[in-house]
């Protein structure tokens, strides 16, 4: 019996550039809910000046927006339940462990 590589039974992926554009649109929509649109426009212009209309520029913009949103949520976004007492911590109903360690 001869060895054969496994057949690709996974669903076809969409092309990389379409995926990057979709992710960028989603993260831009989320960023608009949390940051001043003028700031986002300035950031977009800066990235465009450095990279033009390229996938590399889109990737850099995604990375910057992901980091900014992460720091924003971690600092206590008022639109998020993460990191703020006003939104409530979903894990606060779990009693603390006693004498486990």
Swiss-Prot record:
Keywords in alphabetical order: Activator, AIDS, Cell cycle, Host nucleus, Host-virus interaction, Phosphoprotein, Transcription, Transcription regulation, Viral penetration into host nucleus, Virion, Virus entry into host cell
Gene: vpr
Functional description taken from the UniProt entry: Stimulates gene expression driven by the HIV-2 LTR. Prevents infected cells from undergoing mitosis and proliferating, by inducing arrest or delay in the G2 phase of the cell cycle. Cell cycle arrest creates a favorable environment for maximizing viral expression and production.
rRNA-binding among keywords: no
Protein name in the entry: Protein Vpr
Pfam family, one: VPR
Entry-annotated residues carrying Phosphoserine: 80
Gene3D superfamilies for this protein: 6.10.210.10, VpR/VpX protein, C-terminal domain
Top-level taxon in the UniProt lineage: Viruses
Subunit structure, as described in the record: Interacts with human UNG.
Record-level GO cellular component terms: host cell; host cell nucleus; virion component
Cell compartments where the protein resides: Virion; Host nucleus
InterPro entries membership: RetroV_VpR/X (IPR000012)
Annotated organism of origin: Simian immunodeficiency virus (isolate PBj14/BCL-3)
Residue ranges of the region described as Disordered: 80-101
Gene Ontology terms: biological process: symbiont entry into host cell; viral penetration into host nucleus
């Amino acid at each position: 019996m001869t060895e054969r590589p496994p057949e690709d039974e996974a669903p076809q992926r969409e092309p990389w550039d379409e995926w990057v554009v979709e992710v960028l649109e989603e993260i831009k929509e989320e960023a608009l809910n949390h940051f001043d649109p003028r700031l986002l426009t300035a950031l977009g212009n800066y990235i465009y000046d450095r990279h033009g209309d390229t996938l590399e520029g889109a990737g850099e913009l995604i990375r910057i927006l992901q980091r900014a949103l992460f720091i924003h949520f971690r600092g206590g976004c008022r639109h998020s339940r993460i990191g703020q007492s006003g939104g409530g911590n979903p894990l606060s109903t779990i009693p603390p462990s006693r004498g486990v360690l």
